Amino acid sequence: MQVSVSLYLNMFGFDDPVLNDIVMRIVHDRSIVCLITLDKSQAGGVHERTLLASDAAKDPEGYRTHFVIGESATHQISHTKGFVADGLVGAEGSTNWSASGEGTFVVKGEPGGAGYKAQNNTQTFFTCPDAVARFQAELLAEHVAAQVGRAKS
């Protein structure tokens, strides 16, 4: 599915350069509504910080407009991991957008080998209009909470 209308995304771990490039293409398309919420503690990690600094340097306006790095409304980690694309499909689960979250295949197509990393994660995709709308509203609320928290600090 190619996003053409909107992307609402909340991610705890966000250090996958390939997925980041896809997100940044969406950020650069001014016809797509795009809100990205990332956890403050996780975004401060070495890989995340480097990736996000590169995004901010390449497109400061796009980065400031679409990304919020913060915490939950209760001042805890923002641990939701999911998105809604075009108001049609949602996904939520425990998978971080990171090498260990997605699983790193050392041998093409086969798990295992020296350096293999993979967390035990789940990801559910859904298209029920009511579930998609409710999850999109939750992602928007989390984005606003992170913005408000950032403005206070």
Residue ranges and their predicted role:
Residues 1-2, 16-24, 28-153:
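HKD-type phospholipase D/PLD-like phosphodiesterase module
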